[in-house]
Swiss-Prot record:
Residues 175-204 form a coiled coil. It is found in: Nucleus. Keywords: Coiled coil, Nucleus. Ubiquitously expressed. Disruption phenotype: RNAi-mediated knockdown results in up-regulation of the transcription factor zip-10 and its downstream target asp-17. This is Protein isy-1. Its main location: nucleus. Pfam families: Isy1. The gene is isy-1. Belongs to the ISY1 family. Regulates the processing of the mir-60 microRNA (miRNA), which in turn negatively regulates the expression of the transcription factor zip-10. Does not affect the splicing of zip-10. It comes from the Eukaryota. Residues 195-221 are annotated as: Disordered. One of its GO terms (biological process) is generation of catalytic spliceosome for second transesterification step. It comes from Caenorhabditis elegans.
């Protein structure tokens, strides 16, 4: 009888679950791409599922007896779920929902200070004690100490360090004036030497008088003179330059052509 009653309760539970699913309607499955979800309520539900899965895995990773490989797998899975949760939170904000990033709890380190950057790969629970992971935390602690010391040094620096108050005692003004006078004298001397060199170069490269008229030698020109009586009754001598005729030009070209042919073939 007890067995039959147990079977009846199980069948009743299955029937009730089936009726609830029929009344609720089909449930959308979580898509791989958050852009495919266009319903705000579905996006909220998917985020809750991811948070629930991440919480379970973070609870499981606290057990150091799981072994190195299992802890590394769980830590990878938690990082993947956190990255996926951030993507769904961004999608919820795009659909007009709650901005979870704005109201999220701030992450604190072991001392209680707020961490500057929450991005990157993280280690949870017993995964922090894995081989090679502890050394990473020690290096990060050393870097934080160096940054803190540098911040302390910069905090104590005042205007005297940058030289803004050096002129208040009046010691630098006479020294600066003396150096300024020496520099001015040196610059004036260099300028005078350069000007003298430019003038010397300009005088050496000056061209001759371009307006000087040179007399032409007319001995090589064939001319003809004629005497005429001017208006005042005085005789004037007129020199005519004989221009070559067409025949003279042809003979000259022919002679030049002969010379070129003779030079070409005789050489």
């Amino acid at each position: 009888m007890a067995r039959n009653a147990e079977k009846a309760m199980t069948a009743l539970a299955r029937w009730r679950r089936m009726k609830e699913e029929e009344e609720r309607g089909p449930i959308a499955r979580r898509p791989h791409d958050v852009k495919d979800c266009r319903n705000l309520s579905d996006a909220e539900r998917f985020r809750r599922e991811i948070v629930r899965d991440a919480s379970k895995k973070i609870t499981a990773i606290q057990n150091p007896g799981l072994g190195e490989f299992k802890l590394r797998d769980l830590n990878d899975e938690v990082n993947r779920l956190i990255k996926l949760k951030h993507a769904w939170e961004q999608r919820i904000r795009e659909l007009g929902g709650t901005d979870y990033r704005k109201y999220a709890q701030k992450e604190l380190d072991a001392i209680g200070r707020e961490t500057g950057n929450s991005r990157g790969y993280k280690y949870f629970g017993a995964a922090k004690d894995l081989p090679g992971v502890r050394e990473l935390f020690e290096k990060s602690t050393e870097g934080e100490e160096q940054r803190r010391h540098r911040a302390d040094l910069l905090r104590n620096i005042d205007a005297h360090y940058f030289g803004y108050l050096d002129d208040e005692d009046g010691r630098l003004i006479p020294l600066e004036k003396l150096i300024e006078e020496k520099n001015i004298e040196r610059i004036n001397k260099e300028f005078a030497e350069k000007q003298a060199q430019k003038q010397q170069t300009a005088s050496d490269a000056a061209p001759e008088n371009i307006y000087k008229v040179e007399e032409d030698d007319d001995d090589d020109l064939e001319t003809q003179e004629s005497t005429v009586i001017g208006e005042d009754g005085r005789p004037m001598t007129i020199r005519h330059v004989l221009l070559p005729t067409q025949q003279d030009i042809e003979e000259m070209l022919l002679e030049q052509k002969k010379q070129e042919l003779m030079a070409k073939y005789l050489d």
